[in-house]
Amino acid sequence: MINKNYSLSLWLKYLEQLDKKRIYNLTELKFLAKKLGLLKSESFIFTVAGTNGKGTTCAVLERLLLDSGYQVGLYTSPHLINFVERVRINGFVLHEEEHIDSFQNVELVRNGVLLTYFEFITLAALILFKRYSLDCIILKVGLGGRLDATNIIDSDISIITNIGIDHTSILGRDRISIAREKCGVFRKNKISVIGETDIPCSMYQIAKEKKTILKKIDIDWSWEKKRNYWNFFHSTIQLYNLPETQVPLSSAATALSTLYYSRFKIKEKIIRKSISNVQLPGRFQVISTFPYIIVDVAHNPNAAFYLSQKIDEINITGKIYAVVGILKDKDILGIIDPLANKIHHWFTAPLKTIRTATKHELKKFFPIHNTSILKSIEIAYKKALILVKKEDAIIIFGSFLTVSEFLSLKI
């Protein structure tokens, strides 16, 4: 039984106990959303799906829209430190009391209907958005697309950043199957911006079935990287000598193309001023420089490959140490392999979740001669800190939870 005086932390503990084994089905979720008056929105809806780059694409959309004077809501997941990070209104998180109130509203209407944690908090987020007069709402898909809780809302424009191999136990073991799930966000006669160059056949099939209008990279829009600037090309505009960004250029370009396909007017001077300032915690976040201490949420092979490229760009002259925690359902070898020839010593440990790869499981994948398997991420980091010199680097990565645990340390 929920007490009306529950704090946010108590609410979250309660929500974590909700049905974890329920078969994903949006029917009941839509029923509750309709009762709450959430299915129809006056706001323009962006829905962002894809394997990598969802968060950074959302961040670019949010920044450019805000700096252009629009009222913007953002729903994203997971959070790194505090739950309130998941919902932003006009660039700011909300007070805990507002989240608690939205939870109470969902619980009153739920009346025993089984929901997962993510389904519950998605309804709560939509309640919060409804209370504000927003020009647009940006919804970051949690997992896949077709059966994701965010997909109860019909988007005006959807985005698929890319298609990679991840969450194979749920989405399928190949790109064709994974694309089929992500394309669940497609809507009839609506545009979907595609940032993937190697488009699986299933994406074309579903677009044809749903009469979705695909706007594809390298066909309808494109970008190119130069030495210290980049260019963007779209059917209506060409932008040259754009400043370098702190987020992946693929994310910046995908967001930019999406805005040009939307009803929103973004001035070129805003793009040039704002796009280089977009940053996202946990995405190649530099904590210090002497030595380099860098955190990154890379948790699949594609993201690990990008992380490896970013490490090359900063020209570390000394040794590189890695502090790594990974979930057991991930492609562990695929995550560590892109960095294998860079890492002098691995410090790895289980994470604080039942989904973690255990010490025994980690031992199977990491090289014996230069790996220490510790009890926790905190101990792993402290061990690395003993060895590191000012010309060296420590890279903390492998999962959102790895970065979250590290950033929560009182060090």
Swiss-Prot record:
Cofactor list: Mg(2+)
EC numbers, comma separated: 6.3.2.12, 6.3.2.17
Free-text cofactor note: Binds 2 Mg(2+) ions per subunit.
TM regions (residue ranges): none
Pfam families tied to this protein: Mur_ligase_C
Residues the entry annotates as binding Mg(2+) 1: S77
Biological process, per Gene Ontology: folic acid biosynthetic process; one-carbon metabolic process; tetrahydrofolate biosynthetic process
Residues noted as binding 7,8-dihydropteroate in the record, renumbered to the chain: T116, Y117, F118, E119, L147, D148, A149
Reactions it catalyzes: 7,8-dihydropteroate + L-glutamate + ATP = 7,8-dihydrofolate + ADP + phosphate + H(+); (6S)-5,6,7,8-tetrahydrofolyl-(gamma-L-Glu)(n) + L-glutamate + ATP = (6S)-5,6,7,8-tetrahydrofolyl-(gamma-L-Glu)(n+1) + ADP + phosphate + H(+); 10-formyltetrahydrofolyl-(gamma-L-Glu)(n) + L-glutamate + ATP = 10-formyltetrahydrofolyl-(gamma-L-Glu)(n+1) + ADP + phosphate + H(+); (6R)-5,10-methylenetetrahydrofolyl-(gamma-L-Glu)(n) + L-glutamate + ATP = (6R)-5,10-methylenetetrahydrofolyl-(gamma-L-Glu)(n+1) + ADP + phosphate + H(+)
Domain of life of the source: Bacteria
Alphabetized SUPFAM superfamilies for the sequence: MurD-like peptide ligases, catalytic domain, MurD-like peptide ligases, peptide-binding domain
Record-listed ATP binding positions: G53, K54, G55, T56, R283, D296
MF terms (GO), sorted A to Z: ATP binding; dihydrofolate synthase activity; metal ion binding; tetrahydrofolylpolyglutamate synthase activity
One term under GO cellular component: cytoplasm
Entry binding sites for Mg(2+) 2: H167
Keywords on record: ATP-binding, Folate biosynthesis, Ligase, Magnesium, Metal-binding, Nucleotide-binding, One-carbon metabolism
Pathway recorded for this protein: Cofactor biosynthesis; tetrahydrofolate biosynthesis; 7,8-dihydrofolate from 2-amino-4-hydroxy-6-hydroxymethyl-7,8-dihydropteridine diphosphate and 4-aminobenzoate: step 2/2; Cofactor biosynthesis; tetrahydrofolylpolyglutamate biosynthesis
Assembly information from the UniProt record: Monomer.
Family per record: Belongs to the folylpolyglutamate synthase family.
Function statement: Functions in two distinct reactions of the de novo folate biosynthetic pathway. Catalyzes the addition of a glutamate residue to dihydropteroate (7,8-dihydropteroate or H2Pte) to form dihydrofolate (7,8-dihydrofolate monoglutamate or H2Pte-Glu). Also catalyzes successive additions of L-glutamate to tetrahydrofolate or 10-formyltetrahydrofolate or 5,10-methylenetetrahydrofolate, leading to folylpolyglutamate derivatives.
PANTHER family xrefs: DIHYDROFOLATE SYNTHETASE-RELATED, FOLYLPOLYGLUTAMATE SYNTHASE-RELATED
Protein name per the record: Dihydrofolate synthase/folylpolyglutamate synthase
Gene name of the record: folC
